[in-house]
A protein has these predicted regions:
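Membrane topogenic/interface segments and analogous intrinsically disordered interaction regions
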Residues: 1-254
Length: 254
């Protein structure tokens, strides 16, 4: 193959990549506009764990904003997050269509399960945050409120619109990304970088690393830190099981 043919092939790949990125961006923008019309309802969905927790306390609550543009910008962020979440499968499909022609058949068969598993695990991480971690964390933080009997003045939460969204999205992304642990370890096992024996031997170090990562990725309270660490430990054990299966298949095919 001549130099000009190599350059032509490279340019054609760049052109195809550009086309797929543009298509993904256009779809993301369309959904972003659509989601903005429902941004108040989307934000209401995210606020529901907070609303349920504070309603259980029997006191009147509200969310405040201290900057004129704060609520507007918060709704823009909510719209973008929702649009990205909806279009993520399409974006992954575009990436797959770009790289698939350069893969062998057995490589395609090996990668497809991970493309399916990745968004599922992310969704499970986000669902864990929404339905379990957030309600427990909110109740934990609200327990530090005071009526003023021992503090002189009442201590009561006045949560900001933007800060609440930042907390929720930080937790969702932290859990969603952390839940990719089985995918990462299985891929490393397929390329021969780790094996089940190695993962078992390093288990005690991994436990320490998981709790350290949970402390860095979550707010400084034991509820969310333990809530992230325990599922990760379970996923690590499932990863060892998955790597065992991969090793048996590799030996069988060898």
């Amino acid at each position: 193959m001549t130099k000009s043919e190599n350059e032509g092939g490279f340019i054609s790949h760049l052109t195809e990549l550009r086309k797929r990125l543009i298509h993904s961006f256009i779809l993301l923008f369309i959904f972003f506009i659509g989601c903005y019309f429902f941004s108040e309802h989307l934000y209401g969905f995210l606020v529901e764990p907070f609303a349920n927790a504070v309603n259980d306390s029997g006191t009147d609550r509200r969310l405040i904003f201290t900057a004129l543009q704060e609520t507007f910008l918060t709704y823009l962020k909510v719209s973008f997050f929702a649009a990205f979440f909806v279009t993520c499968p399409y974006i992954l499909m575009q990436i797959w269509k770009f790289i698939a022609p350069g893969l062998y058949k057995h490589e395609k068969i090996a990668i497809v399960p991970y493309l399916v598993l990745t968004p599922i695990l992310f969704f499970l991480g986000g669902a864990l945050v929404y339905y379990l971690i957030m309600p427990l964390a909110i109740k934990f933080f609200l327990s530090f409120e005071s009526t003023g009997a021992s503090t002189g003045l009442p201590i009561q939460l006045e949560a900001k619109v933007s800060e609440y969204l930042s907390l929720v999205m930080k937790l969702i992304f932290a859990f969603g990304i952390s839940f990719q642990l089985p995918v990462v370890l299985s891929l490393l096992a397929r390329v021969g970088m780790v094996d089940a024996k190695f993962l078992r031997e390093k288990r005690k170090y991994v436990v320490v690393m998981i709790f350290a990562a949970a402390a860095l990725l979550t707010p400084p309270d034991p509820i969310t830190q333990i809530g992230l660490a325990i599922p990760l430990l379970i996923l690590y054990e499932l990863s060892i099981f998955s790597v065992n299966i991969i090793e048996k298949k590799n030996k069988k095919n060898a």
